[in-house]
Amino acid sequence: MNRYRTAEAFWQALEGRLRDLDPAKPLAQKRQLLAFERFLERVRQVRPGTILKGGLGLRLRDARARATRDVDILLTGDAEPDGAILITAGRLDLDEYFSFTVQFRRALIGTKGNQFHSKCTIGGKLFAEFDIDAAAPAPMVGEVSAIPGCDWLSFIGISRPTFDVYPLAAQIAEKLHALTVPRQTPNTRDKDLPDLAILARLSDGTPTAIIRAALEATFLHRATHAVPARVGGVPAEWAKPYGRLAGELGLEWRTFEDLQLAVRRFLDPVLSGEATGSWSVAEWRWR
């Protein structure tokens, strides 16, 4: 039970705790992550089986992954999520003073779903705000993982939540699809390449067949272009922002060239059909 009698007293205690936890990270970033998790816990209670994907799912798997500004979920049971579940979830009282409003923003492009905007408040005071991409389930290869969230509210007796996170193989396939989809304008998705390298680092022991099946299912479902034979070239303009990102996150691929090579060694053998066996992170090759 929340021992703080007012929302203001809780806010002050929470801010102090967040500042003490991992002082190197910006307070706003920690606020955002906590708001994400408290909202997702509400959605999970209203709609069990909701699957978390996207950047937040990757961040829960690996704390070194980049921060994200939105929540990306699959709402099981909804042919095309209309927001009713999210609005109901936002109103749940979980005895921690958080409250969420949810408003429709736009329909998602390329998938059945909608984007919503949420404001998280504590005692009527804005704590964080973010977008929610809520989509209906699509063909999915691989196993959903149960990943624990943050233990930041234990001081008021709230246990660490656990979330169902999108399969690694399916996320790899979607990242590659987004990276290679034909475009009429310059590709600005410069975060997809480092995300793929991090996903490779998390995929130790994954069989080639699982990655290949996920690629085939994703590209068939999206129906925009064929599975490529190789990763191919990426815009040279991505090198500068990657240099900053690598420094911020302490990524082991120090240069943009190192990053490209790492991703190609992971995916090109699968795309060409040469890879067999399973992925070895230690050797960074298929064996």
Pin down the residues of each PLM region.
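Compositionally biased terminal segments of proteins
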Residues: 1-287
